[in-house]
Amino acid sequence: MSEKKHIMTYEGVKKLEDELEYLKTVKRKEITEKIKVALGYGDLSENSEYDEAKNEQAFTEGRIIQLENMLKNAVVVDESEISTDIVTVGSIVKVMDFDFDEEVEYSIVGSAEADPMNFKISNESPVGEGLMGKKVGDVVEIEVPGGTTKFEVLGIRR
């Protein structure tokens, strides 16, 4: 079975590379130091500092593996090839959100770099998937967990 490809922008790849570098160089050293200090407390059977440090180490190593896998399977979107005619990964799309009667601008990104609080939505999310392939002037109704929402595409840019 082949690994899932992660569609990403250059910005998204850079962000993951920076996180990976931080975890490998800074975080690993911090955790190693915490473990050394905790070992100095003696009896490991009731040493919560040691347990906490080992749990943090396991989580960090798991995240390193996850990031390495995502980067290994990244398919980077060439910004120069992003269409301004239709919504694709890498597009910045301005829409009219009829539910809130307001204009909103979303960046369509791969799932690995989605950040909805900053209006970066995954092409695999209900709204992202619903907007993919749409053109300026298209009106689309999208099924979301809270029901159906309606958007009109007002503009598309890189």
From Swiss-Prot:
Tree of life domain: Bacteria
Biological process annotations from GO: DNA-templated transcription elongation; regulation of DNA-templated transcription elongation
Gene Ontology molecular function: DNA binding; RNA polymerase binding
Classification via InterPro entries: GreA/GreB_C_sf (IPR036953), TF_GreA/GreB_CS (IPR018151), Tscrpt_elong_fac_GreA (IPR006359), Tscrpt_elong_fac_GreA/B (IPR028624), Tscrpt_elong_fac_GreA/B_C (IPR001437), Tscrpt_elong_fac_GreA/B_fam (IPR023459), Tscrpt_elong_fac_GreA/B_N (IPR022691), Tscrpt_elong_fac_GreA/B_N_sf (IPR036805)
Keywords: Coiled coil, DNA-binding, Transcription, Transcription regulation
Coiled-coil segments: 47-74
HAMAP family named in the record: GreA_GreB
Matching NCBIfam families: greA, PRK00226.1-2, PRK00226.1-4
Role of this protein: Necessary for efficient RNA polymerase transcription elongation past template-encoded arresting sites. The arresting sites in DNA have the property of trapping a certain fraction of elongating RNA polymerases that pass through, resulting in locked ternary complexes. Cleavage of the nascent transcript by cleavage factors such as GreA or GreB allows the resumption of elongation from the new 3'terminus. GreA releases sequences of 2 to 3 nucleotides.
Similarity-based family: Belongs to the GreA/GreB family.
Name of the protein in its database record: Transcription elongation factor GreA
Gene that this polypeptide is encoded by: greA
